[in-house]
Structures are given as C-alpha cells and as structure tokens.
Amino acid sequence: MHGRRHLAASLARALTYAPSRSISSTPSLLQTLDPSTPSPAAAPPTAGRLAELRQRLQADAPSLGDFTYSVEVGTRKKPLPKPKWMKETIPGGAKYAGIKAKLRELKLHTVCEEARCPNLGECWSGGETGTATATIMILGDTCTRGCRFCNVKTSRTPPPPDPDEPSNVAQAIASWGLEYIVITSVDRDDLPDQGSGHFAETVQKLKVLKPEMLIEALVPDFRGDPACVEKVATSGLHVFAHNIETVEELQRNVRDHRANFKQSIDVLKLAKEYAPAGTLTKTSIMLGCGETPDQVISTMEKVRAAGVDVMTFGQYMRPSKRHMPVSEYVTPEAFERYRSLGVDMGFRYVASGPMVRSSYKAGEFYIKAMIEADRAKATTAI
C-alpha cells in the first residue's frame, strides 16, 4: 500500500501541464459578460442595450449538461492552451485520398472522421509501418446516447441500419489490401438486439472475402445483454474491444447515464468467457478528465482482474465548446509511468501516450504480432 501511495504521488507531480496565470481585479458580472456595460456609478444602460445583453446571455447560456458538469467536477473560465507535445499532423497523401474517396463512394462512415481523431492523417496515409488503416463505423453515424466527450451525432430515433452495409463494408475493406482492421459502431439502444446481429454479420462477411485478415471489433456495451456479447464474440473476430472510457469514479460525469463501470467490466468478462481461445480483449480510457493517479491505478487493477489483455491510455481532447472541458494535459512522462505499471500488472500490451486512441495504428501493429505469435505456438503444439 505504501508503494502504491508513493507511485500515485510521483504521478501527481509529473501529471499536469499548468501554465502560469496573471491575477487581476474582478469586474462586475455585467462587465464580464459585456465589456461595454458601464460601472455601477455610471448611468443605467438604455433599453436597447439591455435587450442586446439579454440576447447575448441567451446565446451563451450553458446547457443543462454544462451546468451539471460545472457543479460536479468544476470548469475553467478559459480553455487550457495545448502544450507543445499535443501536435496534430495535417491529413494528406495518396493513400489518405484513396481511402476517403472509397468511403464516400460506398456511403460508409469512420470513427476517425466522426470523432475527429488526431491520428487520422498518420493512419490513413500509412504512417511508419506503411500499412494504411482505418476504423470503420457501422450501424449509421447517429448514436442513441450522448456521452459528454464524444462528437458523434445523437438522436433517440436514428435512421434504421442499412441492410446492405455489412456487404458494402466487407467489400470496401477487402479492396484496400489491409492486414488488420477495426470495426466499431454507434450505440443503438433503439434496436432489439442493440445492433449485435448487424455487427456479427459484418465480421462474418469480411471473413469470407479476406479469411487471413485480422479483425478487431470495438463494440458498445449492448446494455450488458449476454446474448448480444456472445453473438459478436463468436463471430470470428480476433480482438474484442470495449472501452470503459474513464476511471470508475467519473463514469457519470463523462459517459451517458445508461453506461456504467460495472456493466462495461461485465461485458469484457463475458467476451473472454464466450470467445474462442486466443481471442484478445481490450479496453481504453481517456486521461485529463479530472481523474487522480490513485483512481487510474485502481481502475487498471480492476480491468486486469477482469482478464483484459490490452489497455490503452490517451489524452482527452475537447471536440467543441459544447463538450466537457479538458481538466488537464497529462505529461508524456506520466503516460509512460502508466504504461510501465500496466506491463508490471500483467497486461500483454499497453499503449499509452497523449496522442494514443483506442484504435491506434501502432497498437494494432503490436497486437497483430501477438496474434501471429499465438498462432505459431498453437501450430507447434499440435
């Protein structure tokens, strides 16, 4: 226990990027909202200026979600500036253009675009390994949930799934010549099977066209339905991924109210139980949401106890002003400490860094090597 407290304290010292701030006198509320508002000693504003102020207040008023977050977690008056290590690459290149054109042609969606992933340019263009990758998003581009970190569109009644989507996705992926693909989806609480049948069909059709391809399915929680989990876990995939997104203590502040930590852990346990031997399980969390090092360590311990093989850590990036603010920018040194700790805990692979995302190209490269090594061992044993 003493060692864990020491590690948490060490992480806390390296954790936060905190630029200096100047302190100035505090103006009145109306002066803060409208710099042209006179001081209390001056004459009262005209009716026209009052009407203008009311319009500004209405336009800038926080949503109920923003108000709730400000009470529960706390917000900053100004967004934190990005530190030097949070640099994004501008997308480009022939492979990038080719993948984007094919996606538009078949009316397919990627989480890379919908979630504004900072690694989109690297993954689509091939990056260091030369193999282009993309994370395909099925079941449409509209989610039935409204997590406070996610930029995907939401609706209680999204359009019905395209029955041709499994075939279109399989054909598109097969034509790209990839070795490893990630298939994910929005939440579809409106469907009787939560979309699990559509998911399984997509994997199965792809296996027919490209039997040698390694497939990772990054799935929603299916409301914890064991039958839905089993349907996807036994569809022929190699990696069953489901993200817990944040530490246990911040679940209600970060995720939709229909999601929770226990339900996600149970989904990962069920996947390990139902999937064929050798199938890897994987999860991911964002840092910079207000968590403490001790909470991260505790969450890692519970994830590992659920039998999860792979865990990734990345920096939360606010997609827009409508989403929850970044609490802090976690330093690369702190990310490295979490990676090292994860390896010590027994995770087979840990990807941890500011720009890492759950579907991360470098991680997929190492996971592919792990799967091939497991296959080689199994063949030798036979």
Swiss-Prot record:
PROSITE patterns registered for this protein in UniProt: RADICAL_SAM
Cofactor(s), names only, from the UniProt record: [4Fe-4S] cluster
Gene3D superfamilies for the chain: Aldolase class I
Keywords: 4Fe-4S, Iron, Iron-sulfur, Metal-binding, Mitochondrion, S-adenosyl-L-methionine, Transferase, Transit peptide
Principal subcellular localisation of the protein: mitochondrion
One cellular component (GO) term of this entry: mitochondrion
Pathway assigned in UniProt: Protein modification; protein lipoylation via endogenous pathway; protein N(6)-(lipoyl)lysine from octanoyl-[acyl-carrier-protein]: step 2/2
Segments forming domain Radical SAM core: 128-348
Enzyme class: transferase
Transit peptide: 1-30
Compositional bias (Polar residues): 25-34
InterPro entries: Aldolase_TIM (IPR013785), Elp3/MiaA/NifB-like_rSAM (IPR006638), LIAS_N (IPR031691), Lipoyl_synth (IPR003698), Lipoyl_synth_mt (IPR027527), rSAM (IPR007197)
UniProt: [4Fe-4S] cluster 2 binding residues: 143, 147, 150
Catalyzed chemical reaction(s): [[Fe-S] cluster scaffold protein carrying a second [4Fe-4S](2+) cluster] + N(6)-octanoyl-L-lysyl-[protein] + 2 oxidized [2Fe-2S]-[ferredoxin] + 2 S-adenosyl-L-methionine + 4 H(+) = [[Fe-S] cluster scaffold protein] + N(6)-[(R)-dihydrolipoyl]-L-lysyl-[protein] + 4 Fe(3+) + 2 hydrogen sulfide + 2 5'-deoxyadenosine + 2 L-methionine + 2 reduced [2Fe-2S]-[ferredoxin]
SUPFAM superfamilies documented for this protein: Radical SAM enzymes (SSF102114)
Annotated region described as Disordered, given as residue ranges: 25-47
GO MF annotation terms: 4 iron, 4 sulfur cluster binding; lipoate synthase activity; metal ion binding
Pfam families associated with the record: LIAS_N (PF16881), Radical_SAM (PF04055)
The organism's place on the tree of life at top rank: Eukaryota
UniProt similarity note: Belongs to the radical SAM superfamily. Lipoyl synthase family.
Name used for this protein in its record: Lipoyl synthase, mitochondrial
Species of origin: Oryza sativa subsp. indica (Rice)
